[in-house]
Amino acid sequence: MNATASLSKAASLIADPSRSAMLWSLLGGESRPASELAMLANVSPQTASNHLRLLLDAGFLKAESAGRNRFFKLAAPTVGVALESLAAASSRESKLCDAAQISRR
């Protein structure tokens, strides 16, 4: 897969509000159970399971089993850095767009 296709796939995964909420809740480096991630994303456990599988398959997350529970965390610090960078860039872009709209009035 070339770089642009890889970037597009990653962006489409992050673009989903439920998945981005799950990823954002893991930025602190801790592991969270699927049930907690479902609650944080305001989705059913079944829906969360589907989202988590996609994030695992993409390499954004890793999972560890403890008893009957699976705990998820970011696969690498670079995932968190990328998420924070995207959030900062989109925030700056939003502020620039707001400023441009105000100056046109």
Question: PLM features: residue spans?
Answer:
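Short amphipathic alpha-helical segments, especially helix-boundary/capping motifs
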Residues: 10-11, 45, 59, 100
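Short, hydrophobic-biased segments on the C-terminal half of alpha helices
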Residues: 52-53
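N-terminal helix-turn-helix DNA-binding core of bacterial DNA-binding proteins
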Residues: 5-44, 70-77
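Beta-hairpin "wing" of winged helix-turn-helix
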Residues: 56-66, 70-73
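Amphipathic alpha-helical dimerization/coiled-coil segments
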Residues: 1-6, 28, 79-105
